């Protein structure tokens, strides 16, 4: 639970931005298809993906559910689901704390086939306990 009265101004700004981010992809969550990508009972990380029906936009939530005995968690890529194999996508990390720099190459592009066959590593770790990725189709 978040105790708002105990948050710093910077933390309050982060919460406001997180709500704006959520609003930008809430229709994908409410009306899209949901895929469980990683089982938290078998992995220290849980990952859930939502994809809109047109397969043009997606959002992936990956978060640490267990910290036992490990300092780096997502060594293996996560195989995405529900994308169009032929479409080309760009991945953007959202919900970064002010001043934090993503470890993800946000300029790279991937085919849906690549993301579903070979996957993508969101780089979840003890320092990055939660990663939110927006995946959008691009036209070249």
Walk through the language-model features, giving the residues of each.
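Active-site-proximal substrate-binding groove within the catalytic cores of carbohydrate-active enzymes
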Residues: 1-100
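C-terminal beta-sandwich/jelly-roll accessory domains of carbohydrate-active enzymes
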Residues: 66-140
